[in-house]
């Protein structure tokens, strides 16, 4: 029997069953246990959600920005009050260690909601004089009903990153969580309703892409789509959204990010950064620095430091607060990661550690893959070129800065990049040449609410977070006012 009762759709401020009657199993990846049967939304459910969202958005947009901000801040307070319970649910559904979900997932999502609740009041137009008797002004108006599609690695955080600017700007949102990890998005919908959000302003439609995802991107009454996921799926979403009704899109997509360790770097600091950039959340982070470039002369010393740190990883039950490394999110994803590892071996990369599924003792039913490090990698290897989205670090050597930058940029991706060096002049010189939307110097992975997040090239379109994202959920209206008698040429 599933641990939780059937999970319904959330439309119009309440739970409703899917009209088609179909459900999807949601599994605990640490044990293989079925957590719940979740109703699988279809096109009829989407139409109902759009009708609800249109009605709710009219009420929501009619409120002042101060009134909207107060409601969003009440939701922030509820999120923080329920952090532990939400984190535990997130851990059950994603397999991420409780030590992570308690300190990062809900916390950072709430931070973003708090940020937009504050800056929403600064969303102002401009008044510009043209001549003595004429001027124009601009208004930032909400788009209306927007759609969002989340990924399975940071379910509640992604839901909040997408909902916060959209709602702060006066829109309604229909959110489709990943069918793998939909549970906390439903709890978020409850919290928004409890905080006072008008019914219909935040609807949640669990379901797979075939049943509801494609319909969401094509729906003519949805004005914008925000998507987080893989690049291949992102292309399909973008094509569908544009071909149906020229929707605006925001895309936070995949990456194969470089981390350049400079010759003057503290190798202990660099190894700590490389570990976090590859094995946090079991490697299921889009910004992971999976291509680690190290000077050829430092390779062996750096390998030794990495291997020593791998020994300190605590692999186990994600609900155990001592655990720092959990399973992958699903059996299917685990299999894809293992296939990439086998390809790395076949193409000649030298396996330093890991490279296998973990099935000892209590791990036997879970989707655990050992922290894996390959050395002697080359740029043409599949594990170096393709996003794996798992705990697989590829170590590459270089001889000079120009070579490192050229090879770091030789990818279709451009999400993130990092440099480790005590020389800030060198750091800026390298960072300014790296083709990536998010760059870190002597650190990795932090994405505070005011910091825009997004990629270059095929890693995305538009940005999440930051002030510009709030404006991206509005449309600008220009209004000219003539104070003098209008002079016609006829």
Curated annotation (Swiss-Prot):
**Which principal EC class is assigned to this enzyme?**
oxidoreductase
The record's section on InterPro entries has: Ald_DH/histidinol_DH (IPR016161), Ald_DH_C (IPR016163), Ald_DH_CS_CYS (IPR016160), Ald_DH_CS_GLU (IPR029510), Ald_DH_N (IPR016162), Aldehyde_DH_dom (IPR015590), BADH (IPR011264)
Species this chain originates from: Xanthomonas axonopodis pv. citri (strain 306)
Cofactor, how bound (note): Binds 2 potassium ions per subunit.
Q: Which residues form the active site?
A: 162 (charge relay system), 252 (proton acceptor), 286 (nucleophile), 464 (charge relay system)
Q: What is this protein called?
A: Betaine aldehyde dehydrogenase
A Pfam short name: Aldedh
Q: Which family does it belong to?
A: Belongs to the aldehyde dehydrogenase family.
What are the alphabetically sorted keywords of the record? Metal-binding, NAD, NADP, Oxidation, Oxidoreductase, Potassium
Binding-site positions, K(+) 2: 246, 457, 460
Query: In UniProt terms, what function does this protein have?
Result: Involved in the biosynthesis of the osmoprotectant glycine betaine. Catalyzes the irreversible oxidation of betaine aldehyde to the corresponding acid.
Site note Seems to be a necessary countercharge to the potassium cations, residues: 248
Which residues make up the binding site for K(+) 1? 93, 180
Q: What is the lineage of its organism?
A: Bacteria, Pseudomonadati, Pseudomonadota, Gammaproteobacteria, Lysobacterales
What HAMAP family has UniProt attached to this entry?
BADH
State the encoding gene: betB
């Amino acid at each position: 029997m599933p641990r939780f009762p059937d999970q319904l759709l959330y439309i119009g401020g309440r739970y409703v069953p899917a009209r088609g009657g179909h459900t999807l199993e949601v599994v605990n990846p640490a044990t293989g246990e079925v957590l719940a049967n979740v109703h699988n939304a279809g096109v009829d459910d989407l139409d109902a959600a759009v009708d609800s969202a249109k009605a709710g958005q009219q009420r929501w947009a009619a409120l002042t920005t101060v009134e909207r901000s107060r409601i969003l801040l009440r939701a922030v307070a509820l999120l923080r009050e329920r952090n532990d319970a939400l984190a535990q649910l997130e851990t059950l559904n994603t397999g991420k260690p409780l030590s992570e979900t308690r300190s990062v997932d809900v916390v950072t999502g709430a931070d973003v909601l708090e940020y937009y609740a504050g800056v929403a009041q600064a969303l102002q137009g401009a008044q510009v004089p043209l001549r003595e008797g004429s001027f124009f002004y601009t208004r930032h108006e909400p788009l209306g009903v927007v759609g969002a599609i989340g990924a399975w690695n940071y379910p509640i955080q992604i839901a909040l990153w997408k909902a916060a600017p959209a709602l702060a700007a006066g829109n309604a949102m229909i959110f489709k969580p990943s069918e793998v990890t939909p549970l906390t998005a439903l709890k978020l919908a409850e919290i928004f309703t409890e905080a006072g959000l008008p019914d219909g302003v935040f609807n949640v439609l669990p379901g797979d892409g075939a049943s509801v995802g494609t319909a969401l991107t094509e729906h003519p009454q949805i004005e914008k789509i925000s998507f987080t996921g893989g690049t291949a799926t992102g292309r399909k979403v973008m094509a569908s959204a544009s071909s149906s009704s020229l929707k605006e899109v925001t895309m936070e997509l995949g990456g194969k990010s470089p981390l350049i360790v400079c010759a003057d770097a503290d190798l202990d600091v660099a190894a700590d950064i490389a570990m976090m950039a590859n094995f946090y959340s079991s490697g299921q982070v889009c910004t992971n620095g999976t291509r680690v470039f190290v000077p050829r002369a430092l390779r062996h010393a750096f390998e030794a430091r990495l291997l020593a740190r791998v020994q300190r990883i605590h692999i186990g039950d994600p609900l155990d607060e001592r655990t720092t490394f959990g399973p992958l999110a699903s059996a299917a994803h685990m299999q894809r990661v293992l296939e990439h590892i086998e390809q790395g071996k076949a193409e000649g990369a030298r396996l330093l550690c890991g490279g296998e599924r973990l099935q000892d003792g209590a791990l036997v039913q879970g989707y655990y893959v050992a922290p894996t490090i390959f050395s002697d990698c080359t740029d043409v290897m599949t594990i170096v070129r393709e996003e794996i989205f798992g705990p697989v670090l590829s170590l590459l050597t270089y001889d000079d800065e120009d070579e490192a930058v050229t090879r770091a940029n030789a990818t279709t991706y451009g999400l993130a990049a990092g440099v480790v060096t005590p020389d800030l002049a060198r750091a800026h010189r390298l960072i300014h040449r790296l083709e990536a939307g998010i760059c870190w110097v002597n650190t990795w992975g932090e994405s505070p609410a005011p910091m825009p997040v997004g990629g270059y090239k095929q890693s995305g379109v538009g940005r999440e977070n930051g002030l510009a994202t709030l404006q991206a959920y509005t449309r600008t209206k220009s209004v000219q006012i003539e104070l003098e008698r209008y002079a016609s040429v006829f």
